[in-house]
């Protein structure tokens, strides 16, 4: 089983789901708990992990990740570079590329973009209208992509590889659309984007 570090925003949902299927999860935080199962420093959590999940507000990414030893680490990037304009969610991308590409450049990690295009509660799997929840995955590393795809299968989710890491730009746009439809327009958090193919 993978030892996993999940950070901040989606940590409870994804961490709980991974724990439920047998993985050992530790959480990184600025102010660690006295109990390791509740939270470690970011550095200690990364040192423990075979897989790191980054689920931070994008504005905190550089501050948190830059000091960490992540070169070559397997890392899931679940961040979205989000801003708001008069109550409407807008993409606030880095100067070049996507959040996923920036995290890869910053850390030297083997980044898989994923778990960022639906509500956190869907990390635990399940179906909507009889269809599994799709997880859009972008990565330049085939082995890392395979590991994360297998995790999706374990969680009862359907991995949908969408291509190289630069495709993270598209999934981050999709996340903004999800926020607009599900939250701003009030369609509800059960809304997901599903790939439907004719047999």
For each predicted feature, which ranges?
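NAD(P)+-binding Rossmann beta1-loop-alpha1 motif at the extreme N-terminus of oxidoreductases
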Residues: 1-40
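Conserved dinucleotide-binding and phosphotransfer motif residues
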Residues: 21, 48, 155
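Rossmann-like NAD(P)-binding element
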Residues: 42-74, 78-86
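Active-site-lining helix/loop region of Rossmann-like oxidoreductase modules
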Residues: 133-199
């Amino acid at each position: 089983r993978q030892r996993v570090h999940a950070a901040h925003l989606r940590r409870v949902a994804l961490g709980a789901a991974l724990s439920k299927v047998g993985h050992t999860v530790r959480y990184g935080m600025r102010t660690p708990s006295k109990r390791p199962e509740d939270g470690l420093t970011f550095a200690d959590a990364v040192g423990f992990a075979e897989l790191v999940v980054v689920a931070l507000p994008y504005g905190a990414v550089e501050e948190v990740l830059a000091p960490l030893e992540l070169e070559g680490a397997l890392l899931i990037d679940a961040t979205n570079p989000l801003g708001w304009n008069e109550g409407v969610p807008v993409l606030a991308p880095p100067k070049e590329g996507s959040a996923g590409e920036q995290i890869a450049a910053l850390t030297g990690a083997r980044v898989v973009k994923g778990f960022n295009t639906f509500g956190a509660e869907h990390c635990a799997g399940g179906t909507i209208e009889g269809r599994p929840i799709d997880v859009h995955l972008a990565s330049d590393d085939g082995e890392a992509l395979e590991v994360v795809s297998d995790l999706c299968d374990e969680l009862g989710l359907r991995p949908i590889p969408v291509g190289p890491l630069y495709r993270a730009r598209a999934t981050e746009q999709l996340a903004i659309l999800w926020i607009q439809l599900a939250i701003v327009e009030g369609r509800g958090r059960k809304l997901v984007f599903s790939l439907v193919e004719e047999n």
